[in-house]
Amino acid sequence: MRKHTAITTFILLGLTEDPQLQVLLFMFLFITYMLSVTGKLTIIALTMLDPHLKTPMYFFLQNLSFLEISFTATCVPRFLYSISTGNKIITYNACVIQLFFADLFGVTEFFLLATMSYDRYVAICKPLHYMAIMSNKVCKTMVICCWMAALMIILPPLSLGFHLEFCDSNVINHFGCDALPILKIPCSDTSLIEQMVVASAVLTFIITLVCVVLSYTYIIRTILKFPSVQQKKKAFSTCSSHITVVSITYGSCIFIYIKPSAKEEVNINKGVSVLISSISPMLNSFIYTLRNEQVKQAFHDSLKKIAFRLKK
């Protein structure tokens, strides 16, 4: 995004001008943000410290938690600051940085979720070879590939964005620096970059969704062959948390990036963006902790150790 001499800052409109709604919105976002960060940090700490959680699945969960903390940190704190101070101005450079990291963390998360589905496929369909296939080196390589794939997808449209000119309007109808709202205000032609942004989003969505669907197709076929109901329940329970998180993530993003946005739907899209930025990460934390027996057991063991040390 090349800076025009007249534009060095942007104004973020946010979600509402109503003071009472802003107070409620601030409290809601602050609470959900703190719960999300606390939940993610708890998961990261448990997977690092508990020896029972030193498996590939929890290694990926640790990385997913880091990604979600990073993603929410790119936009929610800045929005909370804007609500509390009334300062809606963001500099050009800060906007570019926010856009880059939000896209990077968001796209990487999609690829990581696809990788986690492959991990579940190997664990259920090839249990005897699980630790050999999903070795520590392989897991680290797969995570690095997720980051590299995300970079390759976001850099082409972002590099084109540096050539955009902003003449008269610097008002972004959003609470953060998001690609589609930004592309509505340049005075130069944005048709090519808009197509690239949509193509990048669709490409990410389709590639990762195909991986997820294929993995779970084989998983379901394998589980249905298990002789006992108990075995089937146990196998499904190891996938339930991941399936729930995938459903929330993909379902919310379909609305914004796949469905065409009309002018009257802008406010709805902003609301969905808030859900993705704050509520989804918080829910994911509870899903992985409350529905996972090993994580719950590790959490209880950690509390017992802390209580025992405090009594000394």
Swiss-Prot record:
- Protein's cellular compartments: Cell membrane
The record ties this protein, via InterPro entries, to: GPCR_Rhodpsn (IPR000276), GPCR_Rhodpsn_7TM (IPR017452), Olfact_rcpt (IPR000725), Olfact_rcpt_6C-like (IPR047132)
The chain's Extracellular topological domains, given as residue ranges, are 1-23, 77-95, 165-197, 261-271
Q: Which organism is it from?
A: Homo sapiens
Keywords linked to the UniProt accession: Cell membrane, Disulfide bond, G-protein coupled receptor, Membrane, Olfaction, Receptor, Sensory transduction, Transducer, Transmembrane, Transmembrane helix
- CDD domains annotated for this entry? 7tmA_OR6C-like
Indicate the family of this protein: Belongs to the G-protein coupled receptor 1 family.
Report the main location listed first in the record: membrane
Q: What does this protein do?
A: Odorant receptor.
- List cystine links: C95-C177
List the GO terms this entry assigns under cellular component, sorted alphabetically.
plasma membrane
Gene3D superfamilies named in the record? Rhodopsin 7-helix transmembrane proteins (1.20.1070.10)
PANTHER family registered for this protein in UniProt: OLFACTORY RECEPTOR, OLFACTORY RECEPTOR 6C68
Recorded name of the encoding gene: OR6C68
User: Coiled-coil segments, which residues?
Assistant: none
Kindly list the residue ranges recorded as spanning the membrane.
Answer: 24-44, 56-76, 96-116, 144-164, 198-218, 240-260, 272-292
The identity of this protein, by name, is: Olfactory receptor 6C68
The GO terms describing molecular function are: G protein-coupled receptor activity; olfactory receptor activity
* Keyword Ubl conjugation (UniProt): no
For the Cytoplasmic compartment, the record's topological domain ranges are 45-55, 117-143, 219-239, 293-312
